[in-house]
Regions:
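Exposed, low-structure sequence patches enriched in small/polar residues
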Residues: 1-523
Length: 523
């Protein structure tokens, strides 16, 4: 039989009481973890630079140069590879393969490759063009795009009559230049933002033009310091050789005033080397805001800026002497290049522009069907609106008489468009032509008001006179409809009202109404 289980005896519990003082001594002290070293703060300038670098989406840069030489009077026969193989090796492989070394003139004359006819009058010509363009696209945050661009264009054409000789002249040369002339033009992207919103006074006088006149003394002083041939200050307060009507003084003062550059620190080069940036800005992220998203399908904000400095043409002054010591009748130093006119242009295109595509609000009732359910196609936003405000300036400085012509323009444009999807003409019109499909009818309406003003400012006389100007009101209405793949209809109405600013002109209005039918014979 199984043995009965004996119950286990309970062991007595022993409790040891610890005095309170001992408890305090037994408490473990909490050890704080070592503090982390604070991260070294990054310089804000470095942060900003890094942000710009990482926002770059696309960068392009182009530097193009074109050179050319034309040397008439060559009296050898060119054969294969462009050489003359009678022992002279004229004109040489370097020339035929594109060398632009102008020493070819002396070498050709010395080797007897050029005609020595005294009646020969064709000109040696060399050409040079340089085009520099750059472009970068940045996206600092989603939906915000900035296109930055710059450019610099320079062209130079050199022509000279010459004589070639069979024996060296007194200077040991076989080639003699008779008349050398350089002509060219120049343009570079610029910034005029600092004076864009400066208003004229009621009498058409301008603080910018006054600054232009004042800056002449500062720049005359700087130019005089650069030229060791200039000595002292004249009774008119200008440096010797650089009066208030000197070409260099006037052009540099013009640039400093209208581009708002410091006359004390700006470059003295009439042909700057570094182009300044222009830009275009677009933002389409407003629809991320809830109440905007409920109303509009898309909202685009636009802004564009462009400015250019132009030297329309320049030519060599035949009276110029290297070293800058030759003077004209006004006792000013004669510059190497004679410039007739320079200009500054600026366009805000637009200063601000808004393009909106509205959401359709039709068929909200529960019982109505959408266009897609009715067998049509989803049309998206049918109604579009846009607003643009543009500003532009074209300021030209004519050195003859030293006068500035300012042409300013401002334009407001309001536009609207509406698209009727699946439009069908009444009375079954075009039904046989377009029986298989229905197209959209697109209608646009543009209303614009533009004001142009031309002001002539004369530096010596100190006058400011409006010479031309118009207020132009324009209304344009147009509807387009594609009847078929080959037939397109367009109705248009245009009204333009011109109101002159000066009393010597008369107001006029023009109206144009019509229908355009375009039929494509081949698809």
């Amino acid at each position: 039989p199984p043995k009965p289980k004996t119950p286990k005896k309970k062991e007595p519990k022993v409790e040891a009481k610890v005095p309170d003082a001992a408890k305090d001594s037994l408490k473990t002290k909490s050890v704080k973890p070592p503090e982390k070293k604070k991260e070294q703060e990054i310089n804000p300038a470095i942060k900003a630079l890094a942000k710009v670098i990482f926002s770059l989406k696309n960068v392009s840069f182009n530097w193009n140069e074109t050179n050319g030489l034309l040397l008439p009077g060559f009296n050898r026969q060119s054969e294969w590879l462009g050489q003359n193989w009678d022992g002279s090796s004229a004109p040489g492989f370097a020339f035929t393969f594109g060398s632009q070394n102008q020493d070819i003139r002396e070498r050709a004359a010395k080797n007897g490759w050029l005609t020595t006819d005294s009646t020969f009058n064709s000109q040696f010509t060399s050409t040079y063009t340089q085009n520099i363009t750059g472009r970068a696209t940045l996206e600092p945050f989603t939906g915000f795009n900035i296109d930055v661009n710059f450019n610099r264009n320079y062209s130079l054409s050199t022509t000279e009559n010459y004589r070639a000789f069979n024996s060296p002249r007194a200077n040991g040369r076989y080639y003699e230049t008779l008349a050398r002339v350089e002509t060219g033009n120049f343009s570079i992207s610029n910034l005029m933002w600092g004076t864009s919103f400066t208003k004229d006074r009621k009498d058409y006088s301008s603080t910018i033009f006054e600054r232009f006149a004042e800056n002449r003394r500062i720049l005359s002083e700087r130019l005089g310091n650069e030229n060791p041939n200039s000595s002292g200050v004249g009774i008119d307060g200008y440096r010797d050789g650089y009066s208030g009507t000197s070409q260099e003084v006037v052009i540099l003062s013009f640039l400093s005033a209208y581009s708002k550059k410091s006359a004390s620190r700006m470059s003295l080069d009439l042909f700057p080397s570094i182009p300044l940036p222009n830009w275009t800005v677009r933002y389409d992220g407003l629809t991320k805001i809830a109440f905007v998203k409920n109303l509009f399908q898309s909202v685009n904000l636009n802004h564009g800026y462009r400015s250019t400095y132009n030297v329309n043409s320049f030519t060599t002054d035949v009276s110029y002497v290297p070293g800058g010591n030759a003077r004209d009748i006004n006792m000013d130093f004669i510059p190497k290049r004679q410039i007739g006119q320079v200009s500054l242009s600026e366009q805000f295109s637009p200063l601000i522009g808004i393009d909106i595509t509205w959401k359709n609000r039709n068929n909200k009732s529960s019982g109505s069907k959408s266009a897609t359910e009715r067998g049509g196609r989803s049309s998206g936003g049918n109604f579009t609106t846009r607003f643009e405000y543009k500003r532009d300036r074209n300021i030209s400085l004519t050195l003859a008489g030293i006068q500035v012509t300012e042409v300013k323009g401002r334009e407001f444009t309001f536009g609207a468009g509406y698209r009727i999807p699946n439009f069908k003409f009444p009375f079954g019109l075009f039904k046989s032509v377009n029986s298989r499909r229905s197209n959209d009818l697109n209608t646009t309406l543009d209303f614009s008001v533009r004001k142009n003003t031309t002001i002539l400012r004369k530096l010596v006389e100190g006058t400011n006179q409006p010479t031309a100007g118009l207020t132009i009101i324009s209304i344009k209405l147009a509807s387009d409809y594609t009847v078929s793949e080959r037939l397109n209809l367009r109705f248009f109405f245009e009204k333009t009202i011109n109101t002159p600013v000066v009393s010597t002109s008369y107001p006029n209005a023009n109206t144009a109404v019509g229908i355009t039918i375009r039929f494509t014979l081949s698809q």
